[in-house]
Amino acid sequence: DTVLLLPEDADASARRIRDAIEAAASVRPAVLVSDSFGRAWRTGQAEVAIGCAGLTVIDDWRGRTDSHGRELAATMIAVADQVAAAADLARDKTSRTPAVIVSGLDRYVTGDDGPGCVSQLREPAEDLFR
């Protein structure tokens, strides 16, 4: 049997991978580190981002208006998690493919490393499971 440990700091791992890709290929892509995640009120698992660099983690739409002119009060799109889930579907869970290239999301790629996935964790007072 084999156990694969998660990185202690997945955001730092994503930054190191991003820097290595830039050094080797002269491009600076966004990088995600992901893992399977069980969901409290649903069966099945989904892939979520546990570390990232160079990607908008959350796209906050609060204050914008919807297609009917109503103000959005709660909408915060979990970009990093959605990209992680899409990449997982593209690679096939059992394929042993360690990386996926996702294109067409330039609007979410940032020049700097950004705050990382740690920025999407809830504060303890808002966390129902602590």
Regions found by a protein language model. Name each.
Residues 1, 5, 25-130:
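A structural signal for small-residue-enriched, beta-sheet-centric alpha/beta enzyme cores
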Residues 6-28:
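Phosphate-interacting basic helix/loop segments used at nucleotide- and nucleic-acid interfaces
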